[in-house]
C-alpha cells in the first residue's frame, strides 16, 4: 500500500499485496470472549519466522513494535508509561495463550519487532529503545493485571484518535476498558497519515479470504455504510456485502488507524487517518505523556483499565 502521509510506519507496511494478503489469514481475536481462567500462564519460548525467542525476548519485541509511537528516543522520564504498556501487552499474551495456545496467527493485536528490525527502523538510537523495552519486559513479568481474578485482553494502540472507543459502542463485552479522551495525542508527530488502495488490490484481498464473493462493478459502491463514533473511530462498515468492524477492516486492508475518512476516485481508495492503531484500551503515546508528568505505572494502568494490579515476586 502506498504511503501518502506522515505515519511513522515503514513503507513496506503499506505494500499493496505482499504486506496485506498476510493479514487476511489473521483471526480477529478482539471479537472473541475476552476473559480466561486465572491459572493461564505464558510459554517458555516463541518461534517467529523460524527463530526461537525466549518468552521474555518475545515480549520485549512486542513492546519494541509499539514504541514507534514516540516522537523521540525514550528517556528515564518515559519509563513508567512504557512499563505500563508492557504490562498490558504481557496480560494480553497471557490471555491469548490461555485460550488458544501461542499460535502466531492468534496475534493480530500483539505485533513483534526483532532487534535487527529495531536497528533498521530506529537507526543509531536503537539501543535506547531496546533498553526501554528491556526494562518494560522486566516490569511486566513482575506484574499481573486482572479483572475479578481473571486474565483479560488489554488492547493498546500507539496513538489514539484523541478519543478512545467505548467498548459498548463497538459491541465488545469488555467492562475493564474505559472511554477516555487523549487530547495530547493529536500533537504526536505520527498522528496524521494516509494510504491508498487500488480497486484491484481490494479485489485480490477480498477474494483471498472470500473466494465466492461477488464484487460490484462500480468501485465506489464497494465500501459503504461507514458508521463511526463521535471521535471519528469507525465502528462498522460494509465491504462488498460483508459487514465488518472497523478493526477487522483496518487489519485486512492495512489501514493504520480505525479513525479514517475515505474517498474513492477512478478506482483508487484514499484513506486519511488520525492516530495509529485501534484507538481502544491504552494509548501508549498518552501513557508516556502521563509518565513525563510524574504518574507511576499503577496510576497509568488504572487510568486506562478498570482492573486490579498485583505484584509478582
PLM region spans:
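Conserved, single-site charged/polar hotspot
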Residues: 1-313
Amino acid at each position: 500500500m502506498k504511503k501518502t502521509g506522515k505515519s511513522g510506519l515503514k513503507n513496506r507496511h503499506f505494500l499493496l499485496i505482499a504486506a496485506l494478503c498476510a493479514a487476511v489469514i489473521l483471526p480477529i481475536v478482539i471479537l472473541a470472549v475476552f476473559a480466561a481462567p486465572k491459572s493461564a500462564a505464558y510459554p517458555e519460548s516463541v518461534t517467529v519466522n523460524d527463530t526461537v525467542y525466549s518468552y521474555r525476548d518475545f515480549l520485549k519485541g512486542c513492546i519494541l513494535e509499539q514504541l514507534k509511537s514516540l516522537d523521540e528516543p525514550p528517556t528515564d522520564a518515559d519509563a513508567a508509561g512504557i512499563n505500563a504498556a508492557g504490562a498490558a501487552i504481557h496480560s494480553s499474551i497471557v490471555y491469548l495463550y490461555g485460550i488458544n495456545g501461542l499460535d502466531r496467527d492468534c496475534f493480530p493485536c500483539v505485533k513483534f519487532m526483532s532487534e535487527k528490525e529495531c536497528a533498521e527502523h530506529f537507526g543509531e538510537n536503537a539501543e535506547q529503545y531496546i533498553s526501554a523495552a528491556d526494562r518494560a519486559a522486566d516490569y511486566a513479568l513482575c506484574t499481573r493485571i486482572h479483572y475479578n481474578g481473571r486474565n483479560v485482553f488489554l488492547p493498546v494502540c500507539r496513538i489514539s484518535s484523541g478519543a478512545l472507543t467505548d467498548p459498548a459502542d463497538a459491541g465488545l463485552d469488555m467492562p475493564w476498558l474505559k472511554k477516555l479522551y487523549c487530547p495530547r495525542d493529536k500533537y504526536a508527530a505520527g498522528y496524521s497519515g494516509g494510504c491508498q488502495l487500488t480497486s484491484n488490490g481490494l479485489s485480490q484481498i477480498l477474494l483471498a479470504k472470500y473466494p465466492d464473493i461477488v464484487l460490484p462493478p462500480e468501485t465506489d459502491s464497494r465500501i459503504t455504510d461507514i458508521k463511526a463514533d463521535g471521535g471519528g473511530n469507525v465502528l462498522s462498515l460494509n465491504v462488498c456485502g460483508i459487514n465488518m468492524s472497523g478493526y477487522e477492516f483496518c487489519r485486512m486492508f492495512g489501514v493504520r488507524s480505525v479513525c479514517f475518512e475515505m474517498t474513492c476516485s477512478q478506482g483508487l481508495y484514499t484513506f486519511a487517518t488520525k492516530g495509529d492503531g485501534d484507538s481502544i484500551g491504552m494509548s501508549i503515546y498518552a501513557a508516556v505523556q502521563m509518565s513525563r508528568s510524574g504518574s507511576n505505572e499503577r496510576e497509568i494502568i488504572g487510568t486506562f483499565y478498570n482492573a486490579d494490579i498485583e505484584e509478582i515476586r
